[in-house]
Amino acid sequence: MMVHSPLATGPHPTTHLEPTMHQPHRSLLRKAFQMIPPLDGSLHKGQAGRIGIVGGSKDYTGAPFYSGYASLRLGSDLSHVICEPSASTVIKTYSPDLMVHSYLSSPKEPEAYASHQNQFEQLLDRLHVLVVGPGLGRDTEMQDWAEWTLKTAIQKKLHLVLDADALWLLVKKPDLLRGYPNAILTPNHVEFQRLLKACSIEPREHDDDGLLAMELSKALGGCSILQKGSIDLVAREGSEVAKVSCEGSPKRCGGQGDILSGLVGTWCAWTKLYFERQSQDEKPKSHELPISPEEAWIIAAVLGSEITRTCSRLAYHKFGRSMQSSDMLGYIGEAFEQVMHGHTKD
């Protein structure tokens, strides 16, 4: 009998299941091919995405691993985890593919704190996207680091994904993100209700149409909302609400949201890289479809959701009730192929 390691990430036997892409998304998601960095030998290391994960505290070390490693499995080149010193050694043992920085030190050690802030800020200049929240915790010092991170990243116009306890910070201080459109929030039901209350939005008992998520996007000044649930809803001010209803897994184990944040993060990096490539082209390619920035953010959120759900379904099909989030990691590549199956570059 084969026993899988708790952090097993290698490929599993191929599972033949039907593709998951849904007709309502096809016209939008066909454009996603244009956003994916080409694997044609023209790119250098890092040009397919440099991702930063801010989180990882003494009590929570798995979450940033899941987020960072998922981003690599989808196709980003480099994944940096920025965490508390006591968490760094543990996270390093999970995978040699992650670069782990113990910058989130205590202000009780002023010299080290100032040095780490400086090193962290220099690292931000090299990243395409920052995922804030996995394993962050609600400790005052970690929340202070998250606040500094958001303010600094916004000044640098970094693309952002906010999850978990970064959303707790946003509930307390919604003005931190207000008016900044280059961000995706990924709240679950409880986190979503807290955000509504923080923005003085009256909740409704039933909201399958995503209108509340749209109101939240408007209240925060145009960021994207990926509202997780039995059906994932993606809303952004000025765009139509997208619904992701493809089959996932009935097993709800810890870590799936962290995997989602890493996958969305990679798509956000690809969004940034796509528009950088477009600005460098002397004239647009005649065969390419036009993509607006608003569409690109919707694509990033929808595809992150679709791939996570498909990956979860594949893992559950193999492992059943015993499935853990670590089992999902080896299926990310196959899930990507299934989600994109049926689309053409023509």
UniProtKB/Swiss-Prot annotation:
Q: What does this protein do?
A: Catalyzes the dehydration of the S-form of NAD(P)HX at the expense of ATP, which is converted to ADP. Together with NAD(P)HX epimerase, which catalyzes the epimerization of the S- and R-forms, the enzyme allows the repair of both epimers of NAD(P)HX, a damaged form of NAD(P)H that is a result of enzymatic or heat-dependent hydration.
Q: What cofactor does this one take?
A: Mg(2+)
Where's it found, cell-wise?
Answer: Cytoplasm
Gene Ontology terms, MF aspect: ATP binding; ATP-dependent NAD(P)H-hydrate dehydratase activity
Q: What is this protein called?
A: ATP-dependent (S)-NAD(P)H-hydrate dehydratase 2
Which residues are recorded as binding (6S)-NADPHX? 135, 188-194, 258
Give the binding site residues for ATP. 228-232, 248-257
GO biological-process terms attached to the record: metabolite repair; nicotinamide nucleotide metabolic process
* Reaction catalyzed: (6S)-NADHX + ATP = ADP + phosphate + NADH + H(+); (6S)-NADPHX + ATP = ADP + phosphate + NADPH + H(+)
